[in-house]
Amino acid sequence: HSDHLKAVFGDCEPSIVVTNRVSAAAVRRYFSAQRERPRIISLDALPDSLASSWTPVEGTAEDTAFLQYTSGSTRTPAGVELTNRAIITNVAQIFQALQLQMPARIVSWLPMHHDMGIILAVFVTILGLDFEVMTPRDFIQHPDRWVRRVTAGKQATYTAIPNFALELAARHAKDADFSHVDGIIIGSEP
């Protein structure tokens, strides 16, 4: 994990790093030896009142929305620039392929640093959907919680999950009524 982070930070040379209060000191120590250190922002330390001063950023379809890094499992992680157009196109394709029934809710435990997790988060934000998120750790420790959350609602529910996790949930969860689950995206493994 440390080698991956070093490769990513070395490649993108961030000017800002967003973290939380718990991790802020460790993040500052990590960057302390660098001559050009990024600004460290603890998101959970910002006052709620700050939101009222936010103004939308002007941008074009071809502007880079964010960098998505490869896993680095076979070589040094590489940053891929995702444009606003690419993300909106991907969201539209998912919406069309799933034939979403509205109102819809999304349940996920996928980490935001994973491509499925971040695109899912963008997807629900753009469409203004209900979004229930649990941590990957919570899922691994209690996969039955995810099953209970997915099957809890009475509205059309969708989720995304890798193969291994679906198998884990099937082994540990009790019988559940999936009649309101309209779609499960299964992916990220061969």
Give the positions of each predicted feature:
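Short hydrophobic/charged patches on amphipathic alpha-helices used for structural packing
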Residues: 6, 10, 56, 143-151
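Short, conserved loop/helix-junction motifs that constitute active-site signature segments
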Residues: 10-12, 32-35, 175-180
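Adenylate-forming
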Residues: 16-28, 46, 138, 156-190
